[in-house]
């Protein structure tokens, strides 16, 4: 019973966290950016509380084993802390947010270590959000929906095409990886195909070269790992 309750709580918090791109109810003047940030911070706080409570109630619980990938968030944080201009301290809130994202990385690693069954569900939900964003952007390009910026037609649920294109760029390799793993045409297959197809159509209109490069490199890496496997 306790395991089912824990699984349910982790599922709910993970679903809310992955829904962050759509957080923005207009309650703040800068809701498109601020409310998304607050949403992620709030879910991270709840996730931290649940994880710490689980470790406190069960001290013998096995922690997630470290891999070489887990060194990257700490290395990135260290690089940012060393290069940050403390004399003028321009964006302290972003420095704090980056630190919170590093904590969130290790929280998610522990959650997926305890409940590996959630990996498939979170992956599918993440791809579904990418598909929704791609359809949203396509509707904006066709003039069927309003954009969130007066100078850009394509923004999705974001404020401008930059973060929107970046979000599509991180959903594409995940969708490709799941698509390549499918041995038959099932729901994950069609969901991944839909995400890839719509994102490829919309992404060039974002005019984000960094997103294009990210898509090419990440998808090539995923395909190379698939072929080597």
Tell where the protein language model's regions lie, with residue ranges.
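Short coil/turn segments at secondary-structure boundaries
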Residues: 62-69, 95, 99
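Alpha-helical transmembrane segments of multi-pass inner-membrane proteins
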Residues: 7-16, 20-23, 41-53, 74-86, ...
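N-terminal membrane topogenic signal
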Residues: 1-13, 67-69
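Interfacial helix-loop-helix linkers and transmembrane-helix boundary segments
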Residues: 60-66, 91, 114-121
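Residue-level detector of alpha-helix boundaries and kinks
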Residues: 3, 34, 92-93, 161
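Juxtamembrane membrane-water interface segments of multi-pass membrane proteins
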Residues: 59-65, 182-187
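Short, hydrophobic transmembrane alpha-helix segments
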Residues: 23-37, 56-62
């Amino acid at each position: 019973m306790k395991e089912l309750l824990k699984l349910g709580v982790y599922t709910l918090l993970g679903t809310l966290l992955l829904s962050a791109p759509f957080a923005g109810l207009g309650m703040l003047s800068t809701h498109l950016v601020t409310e998304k940030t607050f949403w992620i911070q709030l879910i991270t706080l709840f996730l931290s509380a649940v994880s710490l409570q689980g470790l406190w109630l069960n001290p013998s619980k096995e922690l997630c084993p470290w891999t070489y990938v887990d060194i990257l968030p700490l290395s990135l944080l260290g690089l940012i802390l060393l290069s940050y201009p403390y004399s003028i301290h321009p964006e302290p809130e972003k420095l704090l947010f980056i630190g919170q994202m590093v904590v969130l990385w290790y929280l998610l690693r522990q959650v997926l270590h305890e409940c590996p069954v959630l990996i498939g569900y979170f992956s599918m939900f993440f791809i579904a959000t990418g598909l929704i964003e791609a359809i949203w952007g396509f509707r904006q390009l066709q003039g069927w929906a309003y954009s969130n910026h007066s100078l850009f037609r394509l923004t999705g649920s974001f404020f401008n095409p930059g973060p929107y294109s970046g979000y599509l760029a991180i959903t594409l390799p995940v969708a490709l990886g799941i698509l390549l793993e499918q041995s038959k045409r099932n729901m994950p297959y069609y969901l991944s195909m839909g995400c890839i197809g719509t994102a490829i159509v919309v992404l060039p209109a974002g005019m984000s070269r960094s997103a294009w490069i990210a898509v090419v490199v990440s998808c090539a890496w995923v395909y190379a790992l698939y072929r080597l496997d």
